[in-house]
Structures are given as C-alpha cells and as structure tokens.
Design a protein with these regions (language model features):
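Glycine-rich phosphate-binding loops of nucleotide-dependent enzymes
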Residues: 2-236
Length: 236
C-alpha cells in the first residue's frame, strides 16, 4: 500500500480548473519529484496534500496511510505526520533561528532538544546563527531553516516546494545533499522542483505535470533519457 496516493484529484479555484484528474502515489521510503513549468499546478497539488488550500476546491481523493484526508485542514494533516517546507521559505523573519525551529515542534513537547540538535548537526550554519533573526539570514540559510523547521515535526512524509528557488549552485548542491540524506535515513520525500535536471538526478521516480495534468511518469533514470523530457525541461 502506498504511503500517499492521489486518485482522480482535481482542484478548482472558483471556475478555474487548475489541476485535472491527477493520479499519483508515493511509497514508504521513496523520494519522488513532481516537475513542470511555472503554473502547471504543482504547488496547488502540494498545498492540497498538506491542507493549505480551500477544501471546497477539491474533487477526488487524497489518501495517506490508507485514510482519505482531502477534507482535512492543515493542522489535522500535520498531526498525521505530513510536513511541508513551502515555496519561498516562509520562515518567521522576526523570530530567531531557534524560535523558528521550536515552532516546527509546536504539536508536541517531547525530545525537542534532541531533534533540534539533529537539525543543527545536519545544518551547522544554523547552529552558528541560532540567536540570529530569521529575516537576516541568507537565502540558502533560510532554506535550511525552513527544512529544519519541517523536520522538527518528525514527519513521515516531507513535502518540499521549490527548495532550490533563487539559490546559488553551490548552495543548491548542499541543499539536495541534505534532502538525499534525509531520505536515506528513512523519511519519505515528495518535492516540486523547476530545476528538472537536479530533480531527476536526485529522486527515484518522477511525474511530469503540464497545464494541471500528469502527462508522464517513470523512473528518474528513464525520464532523464526521454527525448520529450530532454527537449522540454533539460535544455536538450
């Protein structure tokens, strides 16, 4: 049984049909990517999974651990073990690094320090800046903080929306090294990424989204050599 499954999933913004009949799944322990151009419906799909879109816009099913969650609000989805690092980071700019991380653990009180230590071990720069306000961090440090805050939730499923957005190539490499390690340590990962080459070079499987529809899915190894994918997304 898949950890996460979308079955004939649609999303409507009023009369605008933005996501159209998506069927996709993520198995326990997998790392899966959703690629596509801007406006394809990727972020709407991710935010619908995590309970951040208006529920009345949803048609179809979102299933997590065998339970339908398409009507769940965000706090209830988070309680199930789904955490999202949002596009554009969305950290608390007026809170310190440490306070931001504590916000990620607001649903519980146990072993917060141990989890924070693990985040600092993964992202040593956050330890160096733990008393610094989030808004004063560099873009790469803010992305590390956003991911660290999501990890403080101890998620079963980690959702990442455009983790490389606006970052220098060296920082992108560092971020995706961390994503790979997080997955290897047992956390299931689903991420949206416009840098298709990096996405397909990191994940196990990929889905290609165009104008709200999944038009292709395969192993990332196969997608990397697919001529249509190369022409549309890999500059080939």
């Amino acid at each position: 049984m898949a950890l996460l499954e979308l079955v004939d999933f649609h999303y409507y913004y009023g009369n605008i049909h933005s996501v159209k009949g998506v069927n996709m799944y993520v198995d326990q322990g997998e790392m899966v990517t959703l690629i596509g151009s801007n406006g394809a419906g990727k972020t709407t799909t991710m935010q619908s999974i995590s309970g951040l879109t208006k529920r009345r816009g949803i048609r179809g099913k979102i299933i997590f651990e065998g339970k339908e969650i398409q009507n769940y609000m965000g706090y209830k989805v988070a309680n199930l073990g789904i955490a999202q690092s949002l596009e554009g980071r969305r950290i608390f700019s007026k809170l310190s690094v440490e306070e931001n991380l504590k916000m990620g653990a607001y649903l519980r009180k146990d072993n917060i320090k141990a989890d924070m230590d693990r985040v600092y071990e993964r992202f040593p720069r956050l330890l160096e800046r733990r008393t610094q306000m989030g808004g004063t961090l560099s873009g790469g440090e803010q992305q590390m903080l956003a991911m660290g805050r999501a990890l403080m939730q101890r998620p079963k499923l980690l959702l990442l929306d455009e983790p490389s957005l606006g970052l220098a190539p060296l920082i992108v490499k560092e971020i995706f090294k961390a994503v790979n390690e997080i997955n290897q340590e047992g956390t299931t990962v689903l991420f949206v990424e416009q840098n298709s080459k990096i996405a397909l070079g990191t994940a196990h499987r990929g889905y290609v989204m165009q104008t709200g529809e999944i038009v292709m899915s395969d192993s990332c190894a196969n997608l990397l050599t697919n001529e249509d994918v190369k022409k549309a997304y890999l500059g080939g």
